[in-house]
Design a protein with these regions (language model features):
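N-terminal [4Fe-4S]-dependent radical SAM core
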Residues: 1-13, 23, 55, 226-228, ...
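Canonical Radical SAM [4Fe-4S] cluster-binding loop centered on the CxxxCxxC motif
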Residues: 4-43, 56
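Conserved, mostly hydrophobic/aromatic
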Residues: 16, 20, 24, 63, ...
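Short, solvent-exposed loop/turn segments at secondary-structure junctions
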Residues: 35, 72, 100, 190-191
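Radical SAM/AdoMet-radical enzyme domain recognition
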Residues: 40-63, 71-177
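Conserved G/P- and acidic residue-centered "switch" motifs that form tight phosphate/ATP-binding loops
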Residues: 67
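Radical SAM enzyme [4Fe-4S]-AdoMet core and its adjacent flexible, acidic
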Residues: 124-127, 133-139, 143-237, 243
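Cysteine-cluster motifs in flexible loop/terminal segments that predominantly coordinate metals
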Residues: 249-250
């Protein structure tokens, strides 16, 4: 499959639910008007879509939500997608709250990698941002996923006057563990318009000042638009998804 620019497309994101067990300030703090279950694709329908997509050259799938793990049977869906001829990789984006509970099932199903959202290491601030006191569970999930050998990326959204100063502590996740820490610029859509994000250009300059020798990491880390850097002495890498200041289509 090719896009209008002639680029090969081999990657599809599938949102399996609009439900979420958090209420992040910049996302859906008051909840959203949920779709009736009758209007949400069944797993059988999703699998048929995947079968057709593979026929057009899609080989990699990412399972998202909402929070995908609040929908029963998520691991079984992953198992069935992985069994499709031609599928090379199935990954998932999660807030991590339920990940440790279902990790063994997901590994058995063949999950290849996981992206975990984490904006702060401060327990009180986590509850302020997400609406729930669940930071310890998220950290347990990250540790469990890393220990299992699963490839892990930690997604971070920084906000001025909220968690901007925490970038150093969060970056340390990549120092001794094989984790990609990815800083994602705040998108000014929905409730995100009320928040002030942090420029990735400014953040990169701060990292370069603190860690001389930072260089581009040209290894393939996934299918998305992130630009990665290697910090001398770090096991993992740091990535930037510059939704505001980046140019994705040049």
């Amino acid at each position: 499959m090719k896009d209008l620019q002639g680029r090969d497309i081999n990657y599809m994101r599938i949102s399996i639910t609009d439900r979420c067990n958090l209420r992040c300030k910049y996302c859906m703090p008051d909840g959203i008007e949920l779709l009736p279950m009758s209007e949400i694709l069944t797993f059988e329908e999703i699998l048929r879509v995947c079968e057709q997509a593979v026929g057009f050259g899609i080989t990699r799938f990412k399972i998202t939500g909402g929070e995908p793990l609040v929908r029963r049977g998520c691991a079984d869906l992953i198992r069935k997608i992985k069994k499709l001829s031609g599928v090379e990789q199935v990954t998932m984006t999660t807030n991590g709250i339920l990940l440790s509970r279902y990790l063994d099932e997901l590994l058995d199903a063949g999950l290849d990698a996981v992206n975990i959202s984490l904006d702060t290491l401060n327990r009180g601030r986590f509850e302020e941002i997400t609406g729930f006191d669940q930071l310890p569970e998220v950290l347990r999930s990250i540790d469990a996923a890393v220990d299992s050998g699963l490839r892990v990326k930690v997604n971070v959204v920084l906000q001025q006057d909220k968690n901007a100063e925490e970038w150093q502590k969060i970056l340390e996740f990549a120092e001794r563990r094989s984790i990609d820490v990815r800083f994602i610029e705040m998108m000014p859509i929905g409730r995100g318009r009320e928040c002030t994000g942090v420029s990735n250009d400014e953040l990169l300059k701060k990292i370069q000042e603190q860690h001389p020798g930072v260089c581009k990491d040209d290894r393939v880390h996934g299918n998305g638009p992130a630009v990665y850097y290697h910090i001398p002495g770090f096991v993992g890498s740091v990535g930037f998804i510059s939704a505001i200041h980046g140019v994705f289509c040049s």
